[in-house]
């Protein structure tokens, strides 16, 4: 049976377990029923056997019970003893309770008899406890001033204000108001309130301008040793600490203290592409940056707090709702500190006074910061100059100039091998010095300086936005100028504007002052007088004056921002409380705000209006950053700010000045006597200007000026359209001047008239030699077509005989000018084409589009085509001129007799004249055009010389053997002159002149031998040329009367 499994059966009686297992479990049931067993025995056939079985089972159970009793005998005895002892203890407790009841009854009777005396003693003890509590409070209050001073010294301002407010409340309690000894404490607390206010205000002022211990920058702006005046350092600083996010507006679930911006996720930084628009901005590379990683302490150590860690300046404060909100906030460290300082001012009821003093100190502080930045920049520059004996000549200007422009400005500083100084050309025609040119040191220095200053201003304005939003929110919640739980005599008008509650301090005021100071600095850099630059501000003021006033000024967003200069600064409305504090001396520590000038001239190599190009991009980036920081309701504040002033200044002052200056430079460049005077000090052509490519000085100057103007366009993309139009105007004027020089050289000359003929122009375009021309159309021409074209051109030129000398360009200087003009025009065309591909594309061209829709302005590519076409015309004139010169000299072969008496030792005089002219002109043109172009100019001589010599036979009356030798000697002289020209196709020249010698040597053959040669080489010469061989009179040769008919018969087969 399973119920007996746990019984203590000895190991020598294991059979008991087996016997127990045979017993039915029904015998061990809790509600045992014996009736079924009795009925079973009574009805059994063998009752004795069943009874015997039951007895055996009963014996087994008895034996098991004996074993159990034997095993648990000691335990049973101990349980009986314990039970007996428990009964005894209960009995004793009953007796003692009875005695206690008796004693209590007696005590009750005794106390009832002394009730009055007990009441008196209780009242006395309560009074004494209250007196002791008051004494403790008085003792504690007496220590409050020293405690507050200690907290102030430790910069635990929030804890100090908590102690101050708590102590003030205690002093107003009924029991302490009449204590005379506390009057001194009250007086000390009143003084400490003022001292605490000024300490908080000093610290707030320091952190507003990033001079405090918890500022957002790694070091103070006055720690000059850490400043690196490079564009890279400025960019890195901007990336590490620049906020680009719009602030959240209110705290979810407004708390009693009105904590602003303490929810998780506030003050987050947006990506850079929300705040960059240079080049189509940039500047151009956006990186997501977490502002919380940039908060570093002034000593350079990492001051970023761990999440939900209590800031150190609140370590001694009593926990409350504000502290809990700060602890849970994910805002940067400096933002939390600014929130704490504003909360302290609200608890003191000094917001209006603080706002008034901050407004009073804002302009002189910004002025001082800008001056200190300039001085630090100057000192760092001087240190870097002294450290390097020779500074790097390349300046990281930040002006990413268009492709190819760096080459032009490098040329302006180098002297090429031809002895012509491009720097001198640049200085002679450019209205600006190399320092002031795009990419110059002055431009780079101005951009670097302004980048550094505006970056500092942006960081300062970030703090002002934080403070301004906090004050605006708190002003909308409760009276921020009444100390919390502290009676005051100040009675503020609930209908007053929010700016009056903050002492005139709003987000618009620091933005106005900051941009005004920056504008004044820019005017100093540009040397712009206030009269020249304040017209825009006056127009803005008039525009705002026309606007209808808002009925509800508290809720309406500010519609615009107007500022001019320091002397037209906005008026600050200072409350009485703030004015009193200023008179008390806090404002006296500020430097004189009326100081003019920043000392930027000591840093910049040069100042002037052209620095507006390097200023434009930093101002554009500054405006983007400011816009991204402003809350939505203040987004209109930047519409009439610094960027508008800069753009208006560029549009109204810089662009007109630039156009007049560069137009004058262009005029000087193309009108000077040396502008179109070919000059070269090398005998061979070089392909680069640095190595001596002799570009005409006028065109080289125009190219430099065009690149310079487009450099300004790259620096100011918004005005690229106007600047490109300037370049087009200059190029058009220069092209007209080039065409005038070209016409002066070719006017009324036969070569100029011939290239203008449609048939000749078409044939020249199909000529294989034209493949090297800049404006070739690239038509594929077969060899047979090329030969046919050359022959046809030659026939046309020969048909012009006799050619007069007046129809030719006899002045070699004019031909050299055409060669130099062609190369220079091609150089400028290539440069214009590169510039046209890199000109910045302006997204919108608001001005002039409506007028130019019908006829869109020409682009730079069309000017490049015009320049290249004129360069091609120059080369065509030179080629045709040399061919006409050849025809002019060789036309003396006609109508004469070549009956010489002796062997020819020298060529004819006209051939000597031709070859010397070829040599002289080739040497004159060699420095000005490439070898390929020289091959084009002189390559047509051999072909037309060969054709002219062969055709001259038809007009000869007679010729003998020595005459043939004279003509062969002439061809050898021409061949030698042509072979002396580098890059000339000598094989073609030899083939052409060999053909002449072969042709004339046929005259030495007998008639029958000549017919046999013609029969074998009928395609070598034309039938007319073969016929001329028979027509000419050759002394000693027998020619039958039917010679022509026999020739025709041979050629007809």
UniProtKB/Swiss-Prot annotation:
Major location (coarse): cytoplasm
Query: Where does the UniProt annotation locate this protein?
Result: Cytoplasm, Cytosol; Cytoplasm, Cytoskeleton, Phragmoplast; Secreted, Cell wall; Secreted, Extracellular exosome
- What follows loss of this gene? Male gametophytic lethal due to defect in pollen germination and pollen tube growth.
Please give an example of a GO cellular component term from this record.
plasma membrane
Highest taxon of source: Eukaryota
> Per the UniProt entry, what are the Gene Ontology biological process annotations, in alphabetical order?
acceptance of pollen; mucilage biosynthetic process involved in seed coat development; vesicle docking involved in exocytosis; vesicle tethering involved in exocytosis
* Polar residues composition-biased segments: 263-278, 294-306
Q: Which InterPro entries does the protein's record reference?
A: Sec8/EXOC4, Sec8_exocyst_N
Chain spans, region Disordered: 255-308
Keywords, comma-separated and alphabetical: Cell wall, Coiled coil, Cytoplasm, Cytoskeleton, Exocytosis, Secreted, Transport
Q: Which residues form a coiled coil?
A: 91-121
The record's note on quaternary structure and interaction partners says: The exocyst complex is composed of SEC3, SEC5, SEC6, SEC8, SEC10, EXO70A1 and EXO84B.
Similarity section: Belongs to the SEC8 family.
Question: Main role?
Answer: Component of the exocyst complex involved in the docking of exocytic vesicles with fusion sites on the plasma membrane during regulated or polarized secretion. Involved in polarized cell growth and organ morphogenesis. During cytokinesis, involved in secretory processes during cell plate initiation, cell plate maturation and formation of new primary cell wall.
Question: What name does this protein carry?
Answer: Exocyst complex component SEC8
Please give the organism.
Answer: Arabidopsis thaliana (Mouse-ear cress)
């Amino acid at each position: 049976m399973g119920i007996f499994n746990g019984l203590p059966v000895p190991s020598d009686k294991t059979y008991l377990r087996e016997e127990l297992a045979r017993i039915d479990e029904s015998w061990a049931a809790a509600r045992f029923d014996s009736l079924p067993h009795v009925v079973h025995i009574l009805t059994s056939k063998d009752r004795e056997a069943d009874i015997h079985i039951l007895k055996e089972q009963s014996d087994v159970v008895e034996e098991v019970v004996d074993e159990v009793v034997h095993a648990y005998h000691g335990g049973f005895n101990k349980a009986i003893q314990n039970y007996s002892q428990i009964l005894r203890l209960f009995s004793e407790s009953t007796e003692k309770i009875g005695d206690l009841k008796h004693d209590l009854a007696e005590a009750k009777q005794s106390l009832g008899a002394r009730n009055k005396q007990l009441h008196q003693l209780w009242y006395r003890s309560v009074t004494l406890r209250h007196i002791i509590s008051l004494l403790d409070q008085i003792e504690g209050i007496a220590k409050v001033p020293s405690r507050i001073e200690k907290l102030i010294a430790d910069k635990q301002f929030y804890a100090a204000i908590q102690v101050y407010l708590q102590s003030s409340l205690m002093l107003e309690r009924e029991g302490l108001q009449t204590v005379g000894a506390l009057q001194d404490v009250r007086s000390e607390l009143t003084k400490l309130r003022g001292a605490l206010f000024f300490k908080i205000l000093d610290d707030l002022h320091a952190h507003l301008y990033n001079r405090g211990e918890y500022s957002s920058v790694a070091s103070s702006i006055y720690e000059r040793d850490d400043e690196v005046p490079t564009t890279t350092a400025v960019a890195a600083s901007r990336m590490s600490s620049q906020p680009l996010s719009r602030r959240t507006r209110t705290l979810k679930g407004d708390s009693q203290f009105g904590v602003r911006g303490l929810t998780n996720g506030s003050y987050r930084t947006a990506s850079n592409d929300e705040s960059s628009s240079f080049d189509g901005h940039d500047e151009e590379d956006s990186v997501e940056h977490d502002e919380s990683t940039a908060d570093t302490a002034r000593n350079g150590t990492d001051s970023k707090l761990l999440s939900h860690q209590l800031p150190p300046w609140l370590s001694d404060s009593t926990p409350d709702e504000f502290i809990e909100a700060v602890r849970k906030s994910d805002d940067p460290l400096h933002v939390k500190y600014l929130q704490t300082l504003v909360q302290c001012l609200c608890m003191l009821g000094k917001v209006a006074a603080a706002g008034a003093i901050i407004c009073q100190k804002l302009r002189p502080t910004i002025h001082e910061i800008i001056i200190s930045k300039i001085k630090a920049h100057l000192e760092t520059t001087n240190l870097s100059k002294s450290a390097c004996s020779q500074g790097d000549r390349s300046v990281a200007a930040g002006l990413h100039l268009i492709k190819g422009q760096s080459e032009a400005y490098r040329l302006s500083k180098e002297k090429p091998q031809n002895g012509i100084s491009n720097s001198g050309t640049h200085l002679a025609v450019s209205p600006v010095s190399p320092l002031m040119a795009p990419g110059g040191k002055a431009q780079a220095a101005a951009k670097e300086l302004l980048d550094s200053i505006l970056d500092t201003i942006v960081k300062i304005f970030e703090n002002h936005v934080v403070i301004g939003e906090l004050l605006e929110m708190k002003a909308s919640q409760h009276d921020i100028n009444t100390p919390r739980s502290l009676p005051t005599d100040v009675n503020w008008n609930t209908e007053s504007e929010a700016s009056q509650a903050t002492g005139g301090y709003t987000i618009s005021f620091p933005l106005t002052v900051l941009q005004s100071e920056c504008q004044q600095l820019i005017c100093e850099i540009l040397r712009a007088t206030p009269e020249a630059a304040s017209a825009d501000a006056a127009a803005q003021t008039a525009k705002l004056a026309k606007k209808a006033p808002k009925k509800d000024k508290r809720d309406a967003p500010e519609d615009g921002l107007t500022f001019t200069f320091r002397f037209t600064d906005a008026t600050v409305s200072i409350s009485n409380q703030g004015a009193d504090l200023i008179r008390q001396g806090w404002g006296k520590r500020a430097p004189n705000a009326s100081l003019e000038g920043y000392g930027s001239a000591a840093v910049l190599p040069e100042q002037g209006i052209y620095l507006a190009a390097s200023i434009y991009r930093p101002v554009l980036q500054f405006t983007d950053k400011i816009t991204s920081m402003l809350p939505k309701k203040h987004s209109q504040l930047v519409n009439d700010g610094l960027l508008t002033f800069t753009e208006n200044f560029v549009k109204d002052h810089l662009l007109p000045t630039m156009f007049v200056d560069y137009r004058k430079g262009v005029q000087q460049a193309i009108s000077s006597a040396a502008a179109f005077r070919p000059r070269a000090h090398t005998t061979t052509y070089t392909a680069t200007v640095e190595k001596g490519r002799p570009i005409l000085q006028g065109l080289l100057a125009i190219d430099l000026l065009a690149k310079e103007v487009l450099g300004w366009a790259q620096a100011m993309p918004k005005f690229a359209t106007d600047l490109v139009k300037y370049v087009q105007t200059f190029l058009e004027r220069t092209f007209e001047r080039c065409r005038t020089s070209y016409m002066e050289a070719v006017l009324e000359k036969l070569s100029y008239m011939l290239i203008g003929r449609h048939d000749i122009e078409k044939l020249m375009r199909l000529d294989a030699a034209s493949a090297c021309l800049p404006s070739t159309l690239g038509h594929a021409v077969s060899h047979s077509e090329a030969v046919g074209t050359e022959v046809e051109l030659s026939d046309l030129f020969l048909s012009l005989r006799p050619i007069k000398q007046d129809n030719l360009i006899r002045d070699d200087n004019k031909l050299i000018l055409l060669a130099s003009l062609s190369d220079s025009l091609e150089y400028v065309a290539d440069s214009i084409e590169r510039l046209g591909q890199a000109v910045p594309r302006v997204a919108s061209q608001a001005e002039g589009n409506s007028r130019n829709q019908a006829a869109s302005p020409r682009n730079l590519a069309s000017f490049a085509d015009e320049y290249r076409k004129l360069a091609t015309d120059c080369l065509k004139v030179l080629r045709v001129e040399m061919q006409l010169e050849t025809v002019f000299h060789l036309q003396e072969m006609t109508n004469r007799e070549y009956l010489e008496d002796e062997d020819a030792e020298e060529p004819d005089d006209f051939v000597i004249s031709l070859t010397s002219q070829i040599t002289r002109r080739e040497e004159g043109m060699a420095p000005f055009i490439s070898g390929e172009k020289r091959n084009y100019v002189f390559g047509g001589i051999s072909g037309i010389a060969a054709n002219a010599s062969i055709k001259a036979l038809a007009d000869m009356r007679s010729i003998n053997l020595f005459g043939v030798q004279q003509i062969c000697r002439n061809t050898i002289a021409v061949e030698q002159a042509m072979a002396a020209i580098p890059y000339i196709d000598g094989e073609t020249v030899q083939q052409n002149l060999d053909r002449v010698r072969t042709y004339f040597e046929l005259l030495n053959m007998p008639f029958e031998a000549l017919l046999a040669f013609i029969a074998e080489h009928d395609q070598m010469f034309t039938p007319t040329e073969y016929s001329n061989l028979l027509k000419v009179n050759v002394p000693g040769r027998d020619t039958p009367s039917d010679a022509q008919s026999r020739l025709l018969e041979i050629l007809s087969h």
